[in-house]
């Protein structure tokens, strides 16, 4: 669907293993290649190493291979993906790409209701369209950060919730939050109301002094579980972790583009790849996520649209930008002290970036500064996570993991596994079902979707990777 640019000079072929649905694990195929753009085509099982040769190992059955065209750019670590294995070194850089299906926003600080009818809204150009029910949503030196980048071809299947409830009108929700918030005045907006404004302010103030004397680092791990129906082809989610630069990002391609014959997974993958490239140009220790997203959006030309959340630990604290219904939360001493709010134009119509100026712009994203200290845990994810787990459920897993000295990779897997379990439970109340009921639907249970989870432990920089 997307033409391969003439400038692509080399290819690196990645072995990708697919297993039974369960936990998502990663084992790196360690090599260096340049600027993977995530455009996937069928390939043979040969493995071509670019720039230098290293020992490669694949653990688990390998059943499918892809090739990733590349152009000159920063070095990456290529990761294999195997769903039924719990494999990975949490100290290694990780990234993965995934999928998307249904709709709905669930947490928002202040909501304005209005009524509209879902359906197709025409856009600019003969091949453009906006699906209001689901369209949500350079030269580098040799010492570039080693990042992991793992690509999947996006699935082309999408399900409208209102197809099960045709003829029903529904209320739209619109977030009226300001575009720039700080941890001092941004409340936790989860449905379980576990944190108040005063708690956030007090916690942030008490941590701020610690930042002045303690250089910090992020120790991160990730897990991705595709929608069961999209396991073979991947999906529309994407994420990256840059360990050296202390940055990470998640994106959720809007599956509704499949109705127009467009795979939005290309867009989210290219957006995250361009975000990694932009991070390489940022001053060390002073990454500006908003500037990174602006550059990445400008460079992303694939058709489709996506949500985006980029987070960076800098000398001044945790900086982030979030656009749409992906997001992140910060857990401290067993409590959720911060949760990024969801952005959406109307019910089931999230903010989304799109190539050109047809969608929302990066400037519409909400920018956050959060004071953090050693012992804090950051959880970032797509709506497949936050639609199915309340804040206190995520926090409970984090508390257990910290006490048991479990690394962030396994913690991410445990969170993703519980989110998948909740998604398949037709009787349990979830953030998704609560939001649907508030919008006038008789809906119970979770929302089956792609699930991307990134867990980062905040540690003193002198520590060796354990929380």
UniProtKB/Swiss-Prot annotation:
PROSITE patterns: PPM_2. It holds the Pfam family PP2C_2. Binds 2 magnesium or manganese ions per subunit. It catalyses: O-phospho-L-seryl-[protein] + H2O = L-seryl-[protein] + phosphate; O-phospho-L-threonyl-[protein] + H2O = L-threonyl-[protein] + phosphate. Mn(2+) 1 binds at residues 252-253. Keywords: Hydrolase, Magnesium, Manganese, Metal-binding, Protein phosphatase. Gene3D superfamilies: PPM-type phosphatase domain (3.60.40.10). Its EC number is 3.1.3.16. InterPro entries: PPM-type-like_dom_sf, PPM-type_phosphatase-like_dom, PPTC7. This is Probable protein phosphatase 2C 55. It comes from Arabidopsis thaliana.
């Amino acid at each position: 669907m997307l033409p391969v640019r003439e400038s692509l000079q080399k290819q690196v072929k990645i072995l990708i293993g697919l297993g039974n649905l369960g936990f998502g694990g990663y084992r790196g195929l360690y090599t260096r290649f340049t600027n993977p753009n995530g455009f996937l085509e069928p390939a043979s099982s040969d493995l071509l190493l670019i720039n230098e040769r290293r020992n490669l190992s694949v653990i688990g059955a390998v059943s499918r291979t892809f090739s990733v065209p590349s152009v000159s750019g920063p070095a990456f670590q290529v990761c294999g993906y195997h769903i039924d294995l719990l494999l990975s070194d949490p100290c290694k850089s990780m990234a993965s790409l995934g999928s998307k299906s249904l709709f709905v926003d669930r947490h928002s600080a202040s909501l304005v209701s209005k009524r509209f009818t879902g359906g197709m809204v025409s856009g600019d150009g003969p091949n453009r369209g906006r699906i209001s029910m689901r369209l949500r949503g350079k030269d580098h030196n040799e010492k570039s950060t080693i990042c992991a980048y793992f690509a999947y071809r996006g699935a082309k299947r999408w399900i409208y919730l209102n197809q099960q409830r045709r003829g029903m009108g529904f209320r739209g929700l619109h977030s009226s939050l300001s575009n720039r918030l700080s941890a001092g005045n941004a409340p936790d907006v989860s449905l379980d109301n576990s944190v108040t404004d005063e708690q956030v302010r007090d916690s942030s103030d008490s941590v701020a002094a610690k930042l002045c004397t303690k250089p910090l680092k992020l120790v991160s791990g990730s897990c991705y579980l595709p929608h069961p129906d999209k396991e073979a082809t991947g999906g529309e989610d994407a994420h990256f972790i840059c360990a050296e630069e202390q940055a990470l990002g998640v994106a959720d391609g809007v599956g509704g583009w499949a109705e127009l014959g467009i795979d939005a997974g290309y867009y989210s993958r290219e957006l995250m790849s361009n975000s990694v490239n932009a991070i390489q140009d940022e001053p060390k220790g002073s990454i500006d996520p908003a500037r990174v997203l602006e550059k990445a959006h400008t460079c992303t030309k694939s058709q489709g649209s996506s949500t985006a959340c980029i987070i960076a630990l800098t000398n001044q604290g945790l900086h982030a930008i979030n656009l749409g219904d992906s997001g992140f939360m910060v857990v401290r001493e067993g409590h959720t002290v911060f949760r990024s709010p969801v952005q959406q134009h109307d019910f089931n119509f999230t903010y989304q970036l799109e190539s050109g100026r047809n969608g929302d712009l990066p400037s519409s994203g909400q920018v956050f500064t959060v004071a953090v200290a050693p012992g804090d845990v950051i959880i970032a994810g797509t709506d497949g996570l936050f639609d199915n787990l309340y804040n206190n459920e995520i926090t409970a897993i984090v508390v257990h993991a910290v006490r048991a000295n479990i690394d962030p990779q396994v913690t991410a897997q445990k969170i993703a596994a519980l989110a998948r379990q909740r998604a398949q439970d037709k009787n349990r109340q979830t953030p998704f079902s609560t939001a649907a009921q508030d919008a006038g639907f008789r809906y119970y249970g979770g929302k089956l979707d792609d699930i991307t989870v990134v867990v980062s432990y905040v540690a003193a920089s002198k520590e060796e990777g354990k929380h």
